[in-house]
Structures are given as C-alpha cells and as structure tokens.
C-alpha cells in the first residue's frame, strides 16, 4: 500500500548508502532518533539529512517530516523498513533518524543528497 508521506521512490542503492551513513554517524554519536528528536533537530537547523522508514504505522507518526524537511531545506531519503533503520542505531526499529554530523563521510553524504535531488525532479 502506498504511504501518503512517501513523496518519491528511493532506489535500493541510495537507501543502502543512507543506512551506511546512519550507522557510521551513530558510531560517532551524531544522530537523533525518534520522531520528536528528529523534528527538534530539523527545527533547530542541526539536521544534515533525515532518513524516514516507509513502513511506519500509523503513518501519522512521520507524516509531517517530508514537508518540514522541505520547508527547512533539509534533504531527506526513505528506507524500506523501520527495522533496518533501527538496527543501524542500536534499537529494534526506528521510524526516522536525523544525521546531525556525518563525520568523515562527506563524499557518501554528498552522493546521497545528489541522488535525492535527481529523484525529486
């Protein structure tokens, strides 16, 4: 079933890059997990990239995130499963994660943002 908050289809390779970046940023302690923390990081201008799971139920939990990201000019990307996203940040599942600092992964970050920009055209 198509989720109303999924605004574009993210290719598998881009989703995997996003998961790799989340895992790396988590190891350096520079992420926010949980929708409330993610929203705060976006509103404070701290977020570099938001990763949103496509299988969130109820969808209202993350429904507002894509619009907020667009308003605040924060790139965002989707991954298929919240369990995959959660496993990268040490919890069972995560509806969304905000990367506050991507550390030494600038090239990976730029490749994700570039791919997302192309998808939204």
Swiss-Prot record:
InterPro entries: eL8/uL1-like, Ribosomal_eL30-like_sf, Ribosomal_eL8-like_CS, Ribosomal_eL8/eL30/eS12/Gad45, Ribosomal_eL8/Nhp2, Ribosomal_eL8_arc. Pfam families: Ribosomal_L7Ae (PF01248). The keyword RNA-binding applies. Disulfide bonds: none annotated. GO terms for cellular component: cytoplasm; ribonucleoprotein complex; ribosome. One of its GO terms (molecular function) is rRNA binding. The keyword Transcription regulation does not apply. GO terms for biological process: ribosome biogenesis; translation; tRNA 5'-leader removal. It is found in: Cytoplasm. Keywords: Cytoplasm, Ribonucleoprotein, Ribosomal protein, RNA-binding, rRNA-binding, tRNA processing. It comes from the Archaea. Part of the 50S ribosomal subunit. Probably part of the RNase P complex. Belongs to the eukaryotic ribosomal protein eL8 family. PANTHER family: RIBOSOMAL PROTEIN L7AE FAMILY MEMBER. Multifunctional RNA-binding protein that recognizes the K-turn motif in ribosomal RNA, the RNA component of RNase P, box H/ACA, box C/D and box C'/D' sRNAs. This is Large ribosomal subunit protein eL8. The lineage of its organism: Archaea, Methanobacteriati, Thermoplasmatota, Thermoplasmata, Thermoplasmatales.
């Amino acid at each position: 079933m198509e989720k109303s908050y999924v605004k574009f289809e993210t290719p598998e390779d881009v989703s995997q890059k996003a998961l790799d970046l989340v895992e790396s940023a988590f190891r350096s302690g520079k992420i926010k997990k949980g929708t409330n923390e993610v929203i705060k990081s976006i509103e404070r201008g701290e977020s570099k990239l938001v990763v949103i799971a496509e299988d969130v139920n109820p969808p209202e939990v993350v429904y507002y995130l894509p619009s907020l990201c667009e308003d605040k000019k924060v790139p965002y990307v989707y991954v298929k499963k919240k369990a995959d996203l959660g496993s990268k940040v040490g919890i069972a599942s995560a509806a969304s994660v905000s990367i506050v600092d991507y550390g030494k992964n600038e090239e990976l970050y730029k490749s994700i943002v570039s791919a997302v920009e192309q998808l939204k055209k």
